[in-house]
Amino acid sequence: MSCQQSQQQCQPPPKCTPKCPPKCPTPKCPPKCPPKCPPVSSCCSVSSGGCCGSSSGGSCGSSSGGCCSSGGGGCCLSHHRHHRSHRHRPQSSDCCSQPSGGSSCCGGGSGQHSGGCC
């Protein structure tokens, strides 16, 4: 019995699995930046859907960020009319008609065609 015990002691130790390298501290994620907006002249107020521009589609509504492309980056008003009395101009009632040279910002107060532009 003493021989068997001595043989077990003389056996090389089992190979250890290699230790993983120490994990580097993960850098803290930077705060999420808002999507890059076009110039201020083609941005809506936050309440009316954010940014407008040629890249945001050409229709009013939540699917296009509340923006429309009429007038070169015009913005939709924050409120949407439920009744569609003007069938020949379905989007102009909710969009600014100011040309692209203006600031084309919309406010939620006025319901006129271009009264919501500043």
Curated annotation (Swiss-Prot):
Compositionally biased spans, kind Gly residues: 104-118
| Induction cue | By UVB.
List the Pfam families. Answer: LCE (PF14672)
- Please note every region of biased composition (Pro residues): 11-23
- What keyword terms does UniProt attach to this protein? Keratinization
Q: Does the keyword DNA damage apply?
A: no
InterPro entries with a match to the protein in the record: LCE
Where is the stretch described as Disordered? 1-23, 84-118
What tissue specificity is annotated for this entry? Skin-specific. Expression was readily detected in adult trunk skin, adult arm skin, fetal skin, penal skin, vulva, esophagus and tongue. Not expressed in the cervix, rectum, lung, colon, or placenta.
What superkingdom heads the lineage? Eukaryota
Leader peptide range in chain numbering: none
Q: What does this protein do?
A: Precursors of the cornified envelope of the stratum corneum.
Provide the family line.
Belongs to the LCE family.
Q: How does it assemble?
A: Interacts with CYSRT1.
Q: What else is known?
A: Belongs to the LCE cluster present on 1q21.
The protein depicted here goes by the name Late cornified envelope protein 1E
